[in-house]
């Protein structure tokens, strides 16, 4: 899996950063899952290597405009392109009213179904939000000025590496049989021999995990959601020098994001949702924010629009 940052600015777009959106590209399928959809997201998609037709799920963290104003326009465009299978939208209960009101008011009729999934109950009781045979999604309540939710996508453990040499040495014919053996199944050959697939595979490989936390001030629930994550994407709106403002607005500083990653034992941190007050011409620059976080959590990176990063 990998992520592409489509918007990394806090509150308003700038000449170099659009407002919040991130695309998660799944390695198991051709699907793309979108996290937040600020104004201008569909323009960012056009400039990226992400195909909007592959978007199957959209996860909204909260109802502030810089995270949702691009949603009606994107859905309308997808409707013109004929996304026949529909899209699932996860988020606060107000999300359905916002989207349907915008579409109705603009006389927009989509050619595909929308399926809304409210996340409040799942977040409050730490229940699984979505699960299939390869992935599961959890969410958690964050700490912001209005209800906000972080999301965790966890890949289930994968079969161990298949020992092809062992199979060929035993004259097992290549083809679909190898796939069955790799899945751990017992296979019977035409010559009467039977083989247990588990004898040909190494130990299971741990699946990848990705966590997206924005908007929030320092939060225990964000730490718990991020436990042992391979990649944590965490908002870092303010410098440590502006900590007072962070607490007033319930946003995170670089130090808060780094401490969350450290306490969660995350493998890698990418900070995003950068306040437009920090520019190359300001006293505190974006590079300053990165250095602040790296002093606490060395394996930290600074997000920028169109950055693509592997989960693991």
Curated annotation (Swiss-Prot):
What is the UniProt remark on how the cofactor binds and its stoichiometry? Binds 2 Zn(2+) ions.
Q: What does this protein do, in the record's words?
A: Zinc phosphodiesterase, which displays some tRNA 3'-processing endonuclease activity. Probably involved in tRNA maturation, by removing a 3'-trailer from precursor tRNA.
Its protein name is Ribonuclease Z
In the UniProt record, what gene is named as encoding this protein? rnz
Q: Where does Zn(2+) 1 bind?
A: 62, 64, 144, 215
Lineage, highest ranks first: Bacteria, Bacillati, Cyanobacteriota, Cyanophyceae, Synechococcales
The reaction(s) this protein catalyses: Endonucleolytic cleavage of RNA, removing extra 3' nucleotides from tRNA precursor, generating 3' termini of tRNAs. A 3'-hydroxy group is left at the tRNA terminus and a 5'-phosphoryl group is left at the trailer molecule
* Oligomer status and interactors: Homodimer.
Domain of life of the native organism: Bacteria
| NCBIfam families named in the record | PRK00055.1-3, RNase_Z
Q: Which cofactor does it need?
A: Zn(2+)
